[in-house]
Regions:
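N-terminal pre-catalytic segment of deacetylase/amide-hydrolase enzymes
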Residues: 1-15
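Structural preference for beta-strand elements that scaffold enzyme active sites
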Residues: 14-16, 37-41, 54-60
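Acidic-and-aromatic substrate-binding clefts and catalytic sites of carbohydrate-active enzymes
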Residues: 22-26, 42-52, 64-68
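Active-site mouth loops of central-metabolism enzymes
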Residues: 14-25, 93-104
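Acidic (Asp/Glu)-rich catalytic clusters
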Residues: 7-8, 30-36, 49-58, 73-76, ...
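N-terminal start-of-domain structural block
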Residues: 17-42
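Histidine/acidic residue-rich metal-binding segments in metalloenzymes
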Residues: 53, 104-105
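Active-site gating loops and adjacent loop-to-helix segments of metal-dependent hydrolytic enzymes
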Residues: 68-100
């Protein structure tokens, strides 16, 4: 039995709204709670990740910190995942140049 059948929606088209980037800011978390969306994904290195509560939350994989603020740091000691200031690299090109597979895993 697939998810839609378990929800009593078998054979129907449905729209599932998913709140992305939870944990990045307090405002993101507040919007998620206020809107009551059914699903979301948490950016665990985000400064507000511990404030996210929900039953159907996934993990948003974070390996870059592309915005000037807020910047995010790796939760591990992986040096190849850090820029000179200790944050994730700003973009994919910088990540690919430096990242070591064993630290990404």
């Amino acid at each position: 039995m697939d998810l839609l059948e378990r929800l009593g929606l078998g054979g129907r088209r449905v729209l599932i709204l998913h709140h992305d980037d939870l944990g990045l800011t307090h405002a993101q978390n507040g919007a998620y709670q206020a809107l009551g969306l059914p699903t979301g994904s948490v950016m665990v290195p985000g400064a507000w990740a511990s404030g996210v509560k929900g039953e159907d939350l996934g993990v948003h994989l974070v390996l870059t910190s592309e915005w000037p603020a807020p910047r995010m740091r790796p939760l591990t000691e992986g040096e190849s995942l850090r820029d000179e200031a200790g944050y994730f690299p700003e973009g994919l090109e910088a990540l690919w140049r430096k990242a070591r597979a064993e630290e990404v895993e």
